[in-house]
């Protein structure tokens, strides 16, 4: 372990005097991987996987302009379907550092996923480092990196997070002597991950909030609470997973993946743990921020997790909150919770829009738009929709549209409304991730977030 720490050169880190020996790092090698991905065509055009906060992002685009055509950038130009290669490329850089000759070399075994993208492209990476003069860029931004590291603990409530988790669950039994590191980069957007590097080291690779990047530490508490979710839901895996392991047989018998999970990619107990870690976050913010409208903040993240495939996150979290009020212990609520998941799972069904995801634009009367659903929906007084305009087959604009006084059918399976828009051809979407509003079935399940209708006026 000492070898790992000593070998990594120019690693900016600061220990947190918290309940744990937590270290925040912004390693030179890790930032190199993030910058390379940001410079690819996918990194520049995808709105999620690379965070593009100015002025840092703009400085990267300007500084590395002379090497924009370097062959490495085409070689590692991954797409959304190549997410394992993308995320593996980013995180595997953590196992590398620069040697005395300025060459990136592997320090220890670590491969986040199957593809060994860094190893296979090492020669091109070192050529890119040399021709771009990357190490000078990293050195010149140390003051900025230091500010992110120094402010991270306060911004993300690290001390409070551990204090809460220690209260509701036992400290992980294998924690003694184990080091926990949070590796950060201002460029990480989506695709966070939590990895056990070896038996003595765990590293989280979360994104960081825009306010932290810009140094806005005191304003917008709601935004900070939302940002806290990313690191909290990784840290609490260390508490949730061991408890789940104790109940692994009960989870297998009472948590039917076919009912609760829609293609999340998390098998068996791992899917349950995702549900639980997000529910524990809801417990934390309710207790830590009693004066804030935490139910609204939770609703936003429930929708995010639902889109990941955990289609009943809102119902699951509500039940965890209910049982926690009685038991005040994570361990003790598992038995009643799993009894509930067994009976409730049989009733879970994700509603959809009838004839959704059509391939051609369908003519519609904007004064009387009719949308039908596969099952009865909750009859809301307003509808929140997102419209994407298409001109010559390309998306040109989009807007959020609020419909007042929609007309619902008696059974809740149809709604009629007027759309006041100048768009000729547009895509009608029913899912807006950062809004508490949404289309929910009468059983409380969110409408399939990937449903849309192609319409024409």
List each language-model region with its residue ranges.
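N-terminal mature-domain "stem" immediately C-terminal to a signal peptide or N-terminal signal-anchor/transmembrane
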Residues: 19-99, 308-314
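Active-site scaffold of zinc-dependent metalloenzymes
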Residues: 106-109, 187, 192-225
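Acidic, low-complexity Ser/Thr/Gly/Pro-rich repeat segments typical of extracellular/periplasmic
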Residues: 351-457
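Auxiliary, metal-adjacent structural segments of Zn-dependent hydrolase domains
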Residues: 142-205, 390-393
């Amino acid at each position: 372990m000492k070898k790992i720490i000593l070998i990594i050169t120019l690693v900016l880190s600061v220990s947190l005097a918290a309940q744990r020996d937590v270290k925040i790092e912004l390693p030179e090698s890790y930032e190199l991987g993030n910058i390379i991905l940001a410079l690819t065509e996918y990194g520049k055009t995808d709105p999620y996987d690379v965070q593009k906060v100015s002025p840092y992002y703009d400085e990267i685009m300007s500084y590395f302009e002379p090497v924009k055509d370097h062959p490495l950038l085409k070689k590692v130009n991954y797409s959304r379907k190549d997410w394992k290669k993308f995320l593996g490329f980013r995180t595997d850089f953590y196992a590398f550092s620069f040697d005395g000759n300025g060459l990136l070399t592997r320090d220890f075994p670590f491969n986040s996923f199957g593809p060994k993208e860094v190893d296979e492209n090492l020669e091109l990476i070192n050529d890119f480092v040399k021709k771009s003069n990357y190490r000078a860029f990293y050195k010149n931004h140390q003051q900025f990196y230091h500010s992110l590291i120094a402010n991270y603990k306060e911004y993300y409530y690290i001390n409070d997070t551990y204090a809460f988790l220690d209260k509701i669950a036992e400290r992980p039994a294998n924690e003694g002597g184990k080091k926990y590191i949070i590796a950060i980069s201002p460029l990480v957007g989506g695709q966070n991950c939590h990895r056990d590097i070896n038996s003595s080291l765990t590293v989280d690779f979360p994104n960081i909030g825009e306010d932290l990047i810009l140094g806005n530490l005191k304003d917008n508490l709601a935004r900070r609470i939302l940002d806290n979710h990313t690191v909290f839901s990784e840290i609490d895996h260390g508490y949730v997973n061991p408890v789940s392991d104790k109940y692994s047989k009960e989870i297998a018998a009472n948590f039917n993946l076919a009912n609760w999970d829609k293609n999340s990619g998390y098998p068996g107990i791992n899917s349950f743990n995702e549900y639980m870690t997000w529910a524990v976050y809801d417990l934390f913010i309710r207790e830590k921020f009693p004066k804030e409208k935490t139910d609204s903040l939770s609703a936003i993240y429930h929708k995010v997790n639902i889109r990941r495939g955990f289609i009943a996150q809102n119902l699951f979290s509500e039940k965890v909150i209910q049982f926690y009020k009685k038991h005040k212990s994570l361990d003790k609520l598992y038995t009643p919770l799993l009894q509930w998941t067994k009976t409730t799972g049989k009733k879970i069904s994700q509603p959809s829009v009838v004839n959704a995801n059509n391939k051609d634009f369908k003519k519609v009367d904007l004064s009387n738009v009719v949308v039908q659903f596969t099952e009865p929906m909750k009859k809301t007084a307003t509808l929140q929709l997102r419209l994407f305009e298409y001109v010559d087959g390309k998306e040109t604009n989009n807007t959020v549209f609020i419909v007042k006084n929609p007309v619902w059918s008696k059974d809740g399976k149809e709604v009629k409304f007027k759309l006041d828009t100048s768009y000729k051809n547009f895509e009608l979407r029913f899912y807006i991730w950062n809004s508490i509003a949404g289309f929910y079935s009468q059983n409380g399940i969110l409408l399939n977030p990937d449903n849309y209708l192609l319409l024409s006026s």
